[in-house]
Amino acid sequence: MELIEKHASFGGWQNVYRHYSQSLKCEMNVGVYLPPKAANEKLPVLYWLSGLTCNEQNFITKSGMQRYAAEHNIIVVAPDTSPRGSHVADADRYDLGQGAGFYLNATQAPWNEHYKMYDYIRNELPDLVMHHFPATAKKSISGHSMGGLGALVLALRNPDEYVSVSAFSPIVSPSQVPWGQQAFAAYLAENKDAWLDYDPVSLISQGQRVAEIMVDQGLSDDFYAEQLRTPNLEKICQEMNIKTLIRYHEGYDHSYYFVSSFIGEHIAYHANKLNMR
């Protein structure tokens, strides 16, 4: 991995690395925050998945997470949201193509050549992190919007791999809302069974489980009713007896002003779970 940025932050280092991804067949950037204790010991890892139009920079520059990661001794890994490059398929819209990988494995041309974000996040990236950084095998996952969707899907489909999961403003029923339907139709065609493999509410209804789900949702979020539908997740978790910590916040929107307001509580939540395991 090639170090391309290095910034001192709260006694540790906020770095950005570039590497070639075998899964995605392109160069990828990934942000890695190494807290002070990482200089002398191995630490657990929190993976953060960002939302539509984002790259590895949004979370590491806007959330203020470094303060809390340093306090709780957690390495934070923030990858890009899709494969990148002039040779990678793209679309003239913000919710498909580069910047909108949806953390799935595309099956349809032209997307299936590079869009294997599910494999990248689940397999390739953790292997790289374990090899290059002072990381233990314990990991948790979180994300925002499309990234919250990805975090929930990865945790629900791999409950033994992630100690805990949380999300900000996640797309919880993508097969039922425009963002998800448009992306799934392009990446997965009209195979509705494949769609449900990347739909948190559907996965839970089919019996997939995690110990607990933490979600924060702003009630002034312009996408809340049409695209996110957080109450669908709350309802299915109640029906399936999955413990939740779902909080609704008056006045907060979909932006990083919202994420930065509560990221400290999410990192503390994951730190507690990681230290218990």
Curated annotation (Swiss-Prot):
The keyword Kinase does not apply. InterPro entries: AB_hydrolase_fold, Esterase-like, S-formylglutathione_hydrol. One of its GO terms (biological process) is formaldehyde catabolic process. The keyword Repeat does not apply. Pfam families: Esterase. One of its GO terms (cellular component) is cytosol. One of its GO terms (molecular function) is carboxylic ester hydrolase activity. The active site is at S145 (charge relay system), D221 (charge relay system), H254 (charge relay system). It comes from the Bacteria. Belongs to the esterase D family. Serine hydrolase involved in the detoxification of formaldehyde. Hydrolyzes S-formylglutathione to glutathione and formate. This is S-formylglutathione hydrolase FrmB. It comes from Escherichia coli (strain ATCC 8739 / DSM 1576 / NBRC 3972 / NCIMB 8545 / WDCM 00012 / Crooks). The lineage of its organism: Bacteria, Pseudomonadati, Pseudomonadota, Gammaproteobacteria, Enterobacterales. The gene is frmB.
